[in-house]
Amino acid sequence: MAYEEYLKDFLEISNITVGDTVKVTKPHIEHEGMLLEKPDYSNENTIILKLDSGYNIGIDIKDAKIEKISEGKKPQIELDPVDKKISDKKKNLSILSTGGTVASVIDYKTGAVHPAFTADDLLRATPELVDYANINAKAIFNILSENMTPEYWKKTATTIYDEINNGADGIIIAHGTDTMHYTASALSFMIDSPVPIVLTGAQRSSDRPSSDAFTNLMASVNAAKSDIAEVTICMHGTEDDSYCDLHRGTRARKMHTSRRDTFTSINMNPLARIENNKVTINDTQVKYTKRNEKELSLNTNLADKVALIKMYPGISPEIIDIYVDKNYDGIVIEGTGLGHCSDDVITSITRATSEDIPVVMTSQCLFGRTNMNVYSSGRRLLQNNVIGVGDMLPETAYTKLLWAAGQTDNVSEIYEIMKTNLKGEMDTTLSQNYFIKN
C-alpha cells in the first residue's frame, strides 16, 4: 500500500523513497532501518522500517525527524524457475485461487513479499506436490471470502468448466474459510462434473508454525485425484495434522471461528477421510458421483435477489415486507425448531407467497429436519404455500433457491426443484448418529 499524501510529503522533503536506509529520530528514541511499503489498515501517521535485526517496526512521525543514510531500491525477490517434473503418468490438476495466495514468498532480510499466485510459487512452498500431480495454478480473482457474491460464483464455475474442458483431471479451489460452504453448495448446483472439484483453505496463515495450509492442500491433491467426482470441501478432521475430512459441498458448514477442524458435515458423515495420502470412503452405503459418471455441463443461471432471513423473538414483519416490496425472487426462512415463525410475521409471509415469491422453510437447529405438520404455526405456513425442505442446510437452501429461481419464473416449478434431491443436499432418512453433542 502506498503512503498517504501527508506521509509522502514528509518523506519527499528528504528525498526518501521505499528501499532507502533511513534514521528516524524522536525525543529519547532513534531507529535506523530500511523504509518498507505501508501495510493495509495501518495508522495513517506511521511509517514502517525493516531493522537490522530482521524485525519490522512502525513509527509515528509526530515530532520525528528523518534522515537518509543510503539510497536503496524497492525490495524485490529474484526467484529461480521450478522443475515441475511434468509426466504423462501423473494426473493434471488445476489449482484456482479466489483470494490471497496459497503460498506467498517472504524475504525476511529485506521485507519484500512476492504475492503472485503461480504454479512456481505454489511448488516453492510445497515442492512435494510435483511427486503427486502435474500442477497448473492461476488466480481467478483476489477477494476476502466475506466479499464473495453470486457473480463471483459464476466466474468460478465458468473457470472450472474451462479447466476441465482443457484436460484437467481434478480441480482444487483455494478459498477463504468464512463462506467456503456457500461457494461449495453454489458450485454443486451450477456444475455437473466428470472429475473431482475440491475446495480447501486454511484457518492459520502459512507463515505460522501451526498452519493447516500444507496438510489441507496435500489432502486436497489426493481428493482431486480420487474417484469422488463431486464438489467437496477438504479440511482438517482434527486439531492435529493426523487426517483431513472430505465433506459433501451441500452438507458442510463452518462451525468454529478458529479451530483447524472447523468444518463439519451436517446430517451425514464426511464422505471420506484422507490420511497418509490415502482416500478412504467412510460409509460404503452412501452413494456419491464417481469419476466420469457424468458429462461436463455448466448452468450459471442464477436469480438476482434471494433473501435468507433468520427468525428470532421480536422480529418485525417489516423485514419480510421490505423484500416483497423490492420484488425479490425468493425468500429462505431460517425458522425455529421444526420450521416455525411467530404469528406476527405470518401475514407478511402470506403476502409474499400471494405475490408469487417462493418462500422456503429451513431450521436454524441445523441438525434434524423441518416438519411443519406438527404445530399450528407450521400448518398455517403450509396452507399459505410455504414449503419445508427437510434436512437441507439454510445456506444450501439459499444457494439452491438462487439457482432454482434462475431456471424458471414458475413458482410451482421452483418448488418442485427445491423438493428434489439434486446434489445430495437432502435425504429422506436421517440417523441420530449424525448429531454432534460433545
From Swiss-Prot:
It comes from the Archaea. Residues 91-421 form the Asparaginase/glutaminase domain. GO terms for biological process: amino acid metabolic process; regulation of translational fidelity; translation. The active site is at T101, T177, D178, K254. Keywords: ATP-binding, Ligase, Nucleotide-binding, Protein biosynthesis. SUPFAM superfamilies: GatD N-terminal domain-like, Glutaminase/Asparaginase. Its EC number is 6.3.5.-. Allows the formation of correctly charged Gln-tRNA(Gln) through the transamidation of misacylated Glu-tRNA(Gln) in organisms which lack glutaminyl-tRNA synthetase. The reaction takes place in the presence of glutamine and ATP through an activated gamma-phospho-Glu-tRNA(Gln). The GatDE system is specific for glutamate and does not act on aspartate. PANTHER family: 60 KDA LYSOPHOSPHOLIPASE, L-ASPARAGINASE. Belongs to the asparaginase 1 family. GatD subfamily. This is Glutamyl-tRNA(Gln) amidotransferase subunit D. The gene is gatD.
